[in-house]
Amino acid sequence: MNMNFLEFEQPIAELLAQIEELKHVSEHVGSSVDLTDEIKHLEKKNEELTRKLFSDLGAWQISQLARHPQRPYTEDYIARMFTDFDEMAGDRAFADDKAIVGGTARLDGQPVMVIGHQKGRDTQEKIRRNFGMPRPEGYRKALRLMQMAERFKMPILTFIDTPGAYPGVGAEERGQSEAIARNLKVMSSLKVPVICTVIGEGGSGGALAIGVGDRVNMLQYSTYSVISPEGCASILWKSADKANVAAEAMGITAARLKELKLIDSIVPEPLGGAHRNVDEMANLLKQRILTDLNELNSLHTDELLRKRYQQLMSHGYC
């Protein structure tokens, strides 16, 4: 797969292009010229440069990484972390929203309910998934699956990655705000463990609608905010060009939200971001979720609900 590089990654892209060119030359000239040492030197230089660049990323750069077109989506994690996934469709009221995927699965043999936003890779898939922006029926499908999980005493695992809930007229007419509000209400009192993870964009109420849980985790280069940096800049400065300034001011990164005690854990990403090594990222996330599950499974239902309530009530009181 050809790697897409963001603007701030261009020095890395140039080094990798040099490495590929040397490898190509080496293959064609055979043993007459040994370029092994030069290639190794450039590969080491590339790793050092990548570590340096990624050691001091700003909020706007992290926001770009969270939206990277090759970043793993919910279905990528389902394929790597779970077995026996059985997708379920529809809200039993209006339609099946493809922006939300969900179903039963096994995590190391334990039955769980998996629910997440799903974006698309190519144009056709993006349209089918509505660019990862759920309509009310998507959130009602998620609610149906969560209530099913509660009946069968299965932990619920959600994967958050959306620019926000779809703001179209039809969605509003069918009760977008009510669907989100109902999810918040029900999730706060579910009698099974709920673990939520922001894997990319955590956009406003559209993210929060599947984001109330006993544990809320974020991947290292994901974001969580009430509005996009571009949206904030358009309101405050009447120009999306100030998005980088807005991103810094909004406190949208995992590190900042951890400081504010709005999330529980930050899941480290492979060097260069989750898209550089999806298998490694899936394994890191799986270990985080298994650790959380082991802790939550040991709690009595009353204790689980009490701790969840305390956590929700503590927000805003750092």
Swiss-Prot record:
EC number(s) per entry: 2.1.3.15
Concerning Gene3D superfamilies, the annotation shows: 2-enoyl-CoA Hydratase, Chain A, domain 1
Q: Name one Pfam family in it.
A: ACCA
Pathway assignment? Lipid metabolism; malonyl-CoA biosynthesis; malonyl-CoA from acetyl-CoA: step 1/1
Q: Which GO terms describe its molecular function?
A: acetyl-CoA carboxylase activity; ATP binding; carboxyl- or carbamoyltransferase activity
> Which top EC class applies here?
transferase
In the record, the note on similarity to other proteins reads:
Belongs to the AccA family.
Q: What is the protein name stated in its UniProt record?
A: Acetyl-coenzyme A carboxylase carboxyl transferase subunit alpha
What lineage is this protein's organism placed in? Bacteria, Pseudomonadati, Pseudomonadota, Gammaproteobacteria, Aeromonadales
Chain's gene name: accA
